[in-house]
């Protein structure tokens, strides 16, 4: 891949600005945790695994900003940093997973001096980024055998390198199949209202030389019924214990259409996206975003002023529509409640 989604460089967090793609490839530098939190909230960085990495790096920056004479003061301020990060996006469980991991690491080194704790947190954030890249490659290896020679794959939103530290989850499966020499092509849903499929997925795949065709969201059923789509692969922001999966709004519609047309529908996600504390998708909090995202496109109005708007950022696909969940530890099928718990224990 010829771009970096996020990295720690010279005690700064550097992110590609995803709101500027595909028109401009711009990298922003962040030196304080509040600006990282705002970047997450403003979708300069997005995608559950990437948000987790950003939160970890934001906490590492925050630890460096803290002025404290005592451990008690330091840890009290660190809790505040973590709370700011936790309030950015409520649905992506990787955010909370990364925050808790950083808190545990800090607590486990409480006996060390404060500068050492700051360096340990920086190292842990970098480790989370490096691990995410390895995890995505493993997801790709596990999912590639599910993609047949000559297949046309439908994907929704962006679950690629831009949504992770690199390589991607759903696009990781597609990349691995392409790297294995399989002749494949991809249909990318544009994914309203933020157009992640149009702006980001198409951009990534074209950079990699993987054939991609862009369609509007309401065309998916048409192409499925015509027999032009062989398999669907999407990412995830949170997966409940029973396999119900929260992903970008519109994913549920794709899954229902896929089942109607007897097309396998797969979810690709790291184990860190599992939330086994939730029995089902009914318990997953769904973020609702500003109405302007629906009523305006690139700053221009596309709806009458004052119209009522609903703008949930995610929906939940019930497990019965999912043919398999592809993780770095393997592919889970069937009894998700049993198999996901077994997977975590491996």
Curated annotation (Swiss-Prot):
Catalytic activity reads: 5-(methylsulfanyl)-alpha-D-ribose 1-phosphate = 5-(methylsulfanyl)-D-ribulose 1-phosphate
Per the record, where is site Transition state stabilizer? 157
Q: What does this protein do?
A: Catalyzes the interconversion of methylthioribose-1-phosphate (MTR-1-P) into methylthioribulose-1-phosphate (MTRu-1-P).
GO biological process terms, semicolon-separated:
L-methionine salvage from methylthioadenosine
Q: What is this protein called?
A: Methylthioribose-1-phosphate isomerase
> Which InterPro entries does this UniProt record tie to the protein?
IF-2B-related, IF-M1Pi, IF_2B-like_C, Initiation_fac_2B_a/b/d, M1Pi_N, NagB/RpiA_transferase-like
Q: Which residues bind substrate?
A: 46-48, 89, 196, 247-248
Q: Which branch of life, at top level? A: Bacteria
């Amino acid at each position: 891949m010829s771009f970096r989604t996020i990295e720690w460089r010279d005690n700064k967090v550097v992110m590609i600005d995803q709101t500027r793609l595909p028109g401009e490839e711009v990298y922003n530098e962040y030196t304080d945790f509040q600006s990282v939190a705002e970047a997450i909230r403003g979708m300069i960085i997005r995608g559950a695994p990437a948000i987790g990495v950003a939160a970890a790096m934001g906490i590492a920056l925050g630890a460096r900003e803290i002025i404290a004479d005592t451990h008690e003061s330091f840890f009290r301020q660190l809790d505040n940093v973590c709370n700011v990060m936790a309030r950015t996006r409520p649905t992506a469980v990787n955010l909370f997973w990364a925050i808790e991991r950083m808190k545990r690491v800090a607590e486990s080194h409480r006996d060390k001096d404060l500068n050492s704790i700051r360096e340990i947190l920086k190292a842990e954030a970098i480790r989370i980024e490096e691990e995410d890249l390895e995890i995505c490659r493993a997801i790709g290896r596990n999912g590639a055998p599910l993609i047949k020679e000559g297949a046309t794959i439908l994907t929704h939103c962006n679950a690629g390198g831009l949504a992770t530290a690199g390589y991607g989850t759903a696009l990781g499966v597609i990349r691995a199949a392409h790297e294995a020499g399989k002749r494949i092509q991809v249909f990318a849903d544009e994914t309203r209202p933020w157009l992640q499929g149009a702006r980001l997925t198409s951009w990534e795949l074209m950079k990699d030389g993987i054939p991609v065709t862009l369609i509007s969201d309401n065309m998916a059923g048409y192409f499925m019924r015509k027999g032009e789509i062989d398999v669907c692969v999407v990412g995830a922001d949170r997966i409940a214990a029973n396999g119900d999966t929260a992903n970008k709004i519109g994913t549920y519609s794709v899954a229902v259409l896929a089942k109607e047309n007897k097309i396998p529908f797969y979810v690709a996600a790291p184990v860190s996206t599992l939330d086994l504390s939730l029995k089902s998708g009914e318990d997953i909090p769904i973020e609702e975003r500003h109405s302007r995202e629906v009523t305006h496109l690139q700053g221009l109005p596309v709806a009458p002023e004052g119209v009522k708007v609903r703008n949930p950022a995610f929906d939940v696909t019930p497990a019965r529509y999912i043919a398999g969940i592809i993780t770095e530890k393997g592919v889970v099928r069937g009894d998700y409640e049993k198999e996901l718990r077994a997977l975590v224990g491996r």
